[in-house]
Amino acid sequence: GAIAARRATVLTEFGAEVMVVAPAAGDSVRELAEAGRLVWKRHAFCEQDLEALNRSFLVIAATSDRAVNDHIVQLCHERHIPVNHAGDQTQCDFQFPAIVRNDPVVIGVNAGGKDHGLVKRVAAELREWMA
């Protein structure tokens, strides 16, 4: 979905090796995959993905199915892999900040998952100030 696409895009911009597991994806994921900037496994998350999960530094559970996200979180916790559950902040081991960039400066804005509106406003003001 849109959340996973945004996060995958940001991670690739910072040089991360990204794998997206999803039967369908938006234009940004498709374009990144075609450019070789991420790997796109075109299927729903399944047991065959456990091998890749075991090699992961971190995982983002951002499917449209809460039960699948919950299952991914459980699998990650069993393997001591930090995980972000896009639909449930209480199951997140880490959070994604709003990114404000004006090379060479990069600023991350986060409110601990408590006030996304505030984060958006602060990030917008920083972008305007840095322009």
Question: What does each model-identified segment do?
Answer:
Residues 1-131:
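Adenine nucleotide-associated cytosolic modules
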